[in-house]
């Protein structure tokens, strides 16, 4: 009997019945379905209700899982007050790239056709449209008889012939304090030689402002020098029909992209630009499409990633690949394009890339971005009351003041910034919470209930497998070993002397019954 019991123990204890498990389970309704009663209408109704609830639960959970894998996001908009804000970088360019007075005979010889001042035969194309004074100067410079051309460099030409901020800047104030041309850093763009205020480069700290409103930002008065504009006798990519400046307000962490993102400021007006800093936070895939910026910007010519840096980087690579040169405003160490390369290759290629090619330069949105919202308003200057005063102050005519002077006032509207943040509409915690809530509502289950079911299923499966297969053989082998051990123990525990001593007559044998034992003796004496 002991061997049989131990064999059953090795084979595995039989799990409790389904009725016993159901009666103690925390899963609602299970005890009513698997009860000890005979099959009845009550049990059938309970089973039907349980299966219906389970089906609804599966449908709801499936819908929640599908919704999660759509990776929806929502946008949170907030305004945060600040005690101070970093003033943005302000880049400005004169819409005229080259000053007429700075174009030399050598410049005209090499770049006259590019500037539409000369035709391909080095002749002035239409003398009837020229101003007499400009025509006389141009005819003298265009006389190339016995002229020996010198080496020409486009970068040097842009730098020398571009408008000088020291000549354009008539007045400058930041937060009521006087500033000067030294506070502007030269930067080259597609508009040529431009200037950036508060660039934050060359070891200069970024300027901050403590208040909002006019008078607490940058206010400058500029002379656009229309008398230095190149005469327009034809159309090229370098030709400008406008008069004024182009302005871009941007973060110090991104280069200016003024030909695409700038706004115009006209002479004869004071332009007010009320700004608000906007901090944008986008989500990376799969919730969004932004690019997570790392220490390595993945750009060839810029240390930090931004959309404008990516565009300039891409345009530079495109021109180097197609024209074997780069424009003056482009970074890198490739040679600068010659005027002929500008006209024949660089300008057409860049125009095609900007306007038509939507696949070559695909720049992803960075996940963190700072931009500046703007509201512009203008008033006419000079007034009739101030025209004579300004003409006398700057030693110009009233007509010149009206045609060339502009005032630009850039300030924060209020001292706060706006955050526009993308957030996950549905996270894993929400998914688990919804599934858990639906489980509790429809079948009264929790995670521990599911563990109960798995534990019971494991015990049943283990018992079935052990009865059919390997466990049974191992049980028999183990039982045999234990049986031998038990027999030896029984022998050791057995004491025959006690039973023999208790025999009333004892046991005696004849002397000859045992060899070499001459005397009679009892069996007790022999064995004990």
Curated annotation (Swiss-Prot):
Q: How is its activity regulated?
A: Potentiated by FMRFamide-related neuropeptides, which are induced during inflammation and modulate pain responses. Inhibited by the diuretic drug amiloride. Spider venom psalmotoxin-1 inhibits the channel by locking it in its desensitized conformation. The homotrimeric channel is inhibited by the spider venom pi-theraphotoxin-Hm3a. Homotrimeric and heterotrimeric (with ASIC2 isoform 1) channels are inhibited by the snake venom mambalgin-1, which prevents proton-induced transitions from the resting closed state to the active and/or desensitized states.
Site positions for Involved in the inhibition by the spider venom psalmotoxin-1, renumbered to this chain? Answer: 352
Write one Gene Ontology MF term. ligand-gated sodium channel activity
Membrane topology (UniProt) = Multi-pass membrane protein
Q: Where is this motif: GAS motif?
A: 444-446
> What Gene Ontology biological process does one annotation of this record name?
neurotransmitter secretion
- Kindly give the Pfam families that the UniProt entry links to this protein: ASC (PF00858)
- Where would you say this protein principally sits, based on its record? membrane
> Mind telling me which residue stretches traverse the membrane in this protein?
50-66, 428-458
Q: Does the keyword DNA-binding apply?
A: no
Query: What happens when you mutate residue 167 to E?
Result: Decreased inhibition by mambalgin-1
Where do glycans attach?
Answer: 368, 395
Q: Where is this site: Involved in proton-dependent gating?
A: 357
Tissue distribution is: Expressed in neurons throughout the central and peripheral nervous system.
The entry sums up its family as follows:
Belongs to the amiloride-sensitive sodium channel (TC 1.A.6) family. ASIC1 subfamily.
Domain-related comment: The second transmembrane domain (TM2) is a discontinuous alpha-helix disrupted by the GAS motif, which forms the selectivity filter by adopting an extended, belt-like conformation aligned approximately parallel to the membrane plane. This peptide belt encircles the waist of the channel and divides TM2 into two discontinuous helical segments. The distal helical segment of TM2 interacts with the cytoplasmic portion of the first transmembrane domain (TM1) from a neighboring subunit, contributing to the structural and functional integrity of the channel.
Give the protein's recorded name: Acid-sensing ion channel 1
Task: Name the gene for this chain.
Answer: ASIC1
């Amino acid at each position: 009997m002991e061997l049989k019991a131990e064999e059953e123990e090795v084979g595995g204890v039989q799990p409790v019945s389904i009725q016993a498990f159901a009666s103690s389970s925390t899963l609602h309704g299970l005890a009513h379905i698997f009860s000890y009663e005979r099959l009845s209408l009550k049990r059938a109704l309970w089973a039907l209700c349980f299966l219906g609830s389970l089906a609804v639960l599966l449908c709801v959970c499936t819908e929640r899982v599908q919704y999660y894998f759509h990776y929806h996001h929502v946008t949170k908009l907030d305004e945060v007050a600040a005690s101070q804000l970093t003033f943005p970088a302000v880049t400005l360019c004169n819409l005229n790239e080259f000053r007429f007075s700075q174009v030399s005979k050598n410049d005209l010889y090499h770049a006259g056709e590019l500037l539409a001042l000369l035709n391909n035969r080095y002749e002035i194309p239409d003398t009837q449209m020229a101003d007499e004074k400009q025509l006389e100067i141009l005819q003298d410079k265009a006389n190339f008889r016995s002229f020996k051309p010198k080496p020409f460099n486009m970068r040097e030409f842009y730098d020398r012939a571009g408008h000088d901020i020291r000549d354009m800047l008539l007045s400058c104030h930041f937060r009521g304090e006087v500033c000067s041309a030294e506070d502007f850093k030269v930067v080259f763009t597609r508009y040529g030689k431009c200037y950036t205020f508060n660039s934050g480069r060359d070891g200069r700290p970024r300027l901050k402002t403590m208040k909002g409103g006019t008078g607490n930002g940058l206010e400058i008065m500029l002379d656009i020098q229309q008398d230095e504009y190149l005469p327009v006798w034809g159309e090229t990519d370098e030709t400008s029909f406008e008069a004024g400046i182009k302005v871009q307000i941007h973060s110090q962490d991104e280069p200016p992209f003024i030909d695409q993102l700038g706004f115009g400021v006209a002479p004869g007006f004071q332009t007010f630009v009320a700004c608000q800093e906007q901090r944008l936070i986008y989500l990376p895939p799969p919730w969004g499409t932004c690019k997570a910026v790392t220490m390595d910007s993945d750009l060839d010519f810029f240390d930090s990633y931004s959309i404008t840096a990516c565009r300039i980087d891409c345009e530079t690579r495109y021109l180097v690949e197609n024209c074997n040169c780069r424009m003056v405003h482009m970074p890198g160490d490739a040679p600068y394009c010659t005027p002929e390369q500008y006209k024949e290759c660089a300008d057409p290629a860049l125009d095609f890339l900007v306007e038509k090619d939507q696949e070559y330069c695909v720049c992803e949105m960075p996940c963190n971005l700072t931009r500046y919202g703007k509201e512009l308003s203008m008033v006419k200057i000079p007034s009739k009351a101030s025209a004579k005063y300004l003409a006398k102050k700057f030693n110009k005519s009233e007509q010149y003041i009206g045609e060339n002077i502009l005032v630009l006032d850039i300030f924060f509207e209020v001292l706060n910034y706006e955050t526009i943040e993308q957030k996950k509409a549905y996270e894993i915690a929400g998914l688990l919470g919804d599934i858990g809530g639906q489980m509790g509502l429809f079948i009264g289950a929790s995670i521990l209930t599911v563990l109960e079911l798995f534990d019971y299923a494991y015990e049943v499966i283990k018992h079935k497998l052990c009865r059919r297969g390997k466990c049974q053989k191992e049980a028999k082998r183990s039982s045999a070993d234990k049986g031998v051990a038990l027999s030896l123990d029984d022998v050791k525990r057995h004491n025959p002397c006690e039973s023999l001593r208790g025999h009333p007559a004892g046991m005696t044998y004849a002397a000859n019954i045992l060899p070499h034992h001459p005397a009679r003796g009892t069996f007790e004496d022999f064995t004990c």
